[in-house]
Amino acid sequence: MTQPTDTPLERIASFTVDHTKLVPGLYYSRRDGDIITFDLRFKKPNTGDLLSNSELHSTEHLIATLLRNSPEKEAVIYFGPMGCQTGFYFLFDNRLLSCEGAIALLQEVFAAAADFSGEMPGKSPVECGNYSNLDVETGRRVCQFYADLIRDWTVEKLAY
């Protein structure tokens, strides 16, 4: 699709959030029909303190695997990193999982990931396009930080 030069592009929803005021936490980002997007913010934006590629990738493998193996797996649409390297997005079907349930699920899977033992899920050249930078200990450390952060999170705290 070619965008005419005289027509301004619509600003996407995530660009309407004032990133100068964001701090680490769990936020309700948007709703698209029955799909809710949560913003899982690990780092304060624009400070230079970013999640490394290994931290993002290792956390993604652990959390995506645990979410898709949870009793709520049918509600899970997507879990993945933000390009800005400050957090992740979690998309879920709100017909199958409430916001309260999603918070509880995230609290559970991050705590489980922090205690994860065994081999990193998907750590092989057949399963992953950059398997060599996956590290269980790195993922566990990042997940422990976030599990501690959201341990007492409630729906009332979801607002940006």
Name what the model sees in each region.
Residues 11, 30-31, 41, 68, ...:
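Arginine residue identity/basic-tract feature
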Residues 81-152:
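Active-site-adjacent, His/Asp/Glu-enriched structural segments that form or flank metal-binding
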Residues 30, 79-80:
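A general structural signal for short secondary-structure junctions and capping/turn motifs
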Residues 70-73:
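Short secondary-structure junctions
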Residues 1-46, 155, 159-160:
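Non-catalytic terminal extensions that flank enzyme cores
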Residues 12, 35-36, 63, 77, ...:
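Weak global preference for isoleucine
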Residues 35-68, 78-79:
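Active/ligand-binding-proximal structured segments within catalytic/core domains
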